[in-house]
């Protein structure tokens, strides 16, 4: 039984590539059938944002930018499914509301990030960019992302040759 897991642990994948090259198998040379594919999808949003943010100034407003960002996330997830070709289950999960113990840590990190940004803007001049804190459970962006991802993949099991697609949005508790 084969399971492929794509995780969103910062720097963990690059650590594996550097230190355990023998673990990597090119997916196109992988001969066994993959049954289940699990996505920790927040990293997919950040990957799409990294690419799209270079074009932020070309969008008339944040809604258009966010719609394009969501579209890219859907397409990227779909491409991963098509490349891996699991035959049973796909789980698409986004981080939900964190446990109380972690909320303070996140709040402190966001506050520090905002202060650093203010200092850099003062030194280098203000950059016009989309507010990344929108990638937080409960924001309008994440609610819109939840709805769109759910609608994009809902009832599409046959199209991908799957038994089940499970979506867990950011409105559900847990990480």
Q: Which residue stretches match the model-derived regions?
A:
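Noncatalytic, typically N-terminal accessory segments of nucleic acid-processing enzymes
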Residues: 2-175
């Amino acid at each position: 039984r084969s399971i492929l897991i794509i995780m969103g642990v910062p720097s963990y994948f690059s650590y594996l590539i550097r230190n355990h090259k023998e673990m990597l198998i090119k997916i196109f040379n992988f001969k066994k059938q993959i049954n289940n594919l699990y996505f920790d999808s927040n990293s997919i949003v950040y990957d799409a944002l990294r690419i799209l943010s270079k074009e932020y100034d070309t969008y008339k407003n944040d809604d258009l930018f966010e719609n394009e960002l969501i579209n890219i996330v859907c397409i990227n997830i779909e491409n991963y499914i098509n490349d891996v070709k699991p035959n049973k289950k796909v789980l698409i999960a986004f981080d939900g509301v964190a446990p109380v113990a972690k909320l303070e840590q996140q709040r402190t990190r966001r506050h520090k990030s905002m202060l650093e940004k203010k200092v850099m803007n003062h030194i280098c001049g203000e950059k016009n960019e989309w507010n990344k804190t929108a990638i937080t459970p409960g924001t309008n962006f994440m609610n819109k992302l939840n709805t769109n991802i759910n609608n994009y993949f809902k009832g599409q099991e046959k199209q991908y040759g799957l038994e089940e697609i499970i979506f867990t949005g950011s409105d559900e508790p847990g990480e």
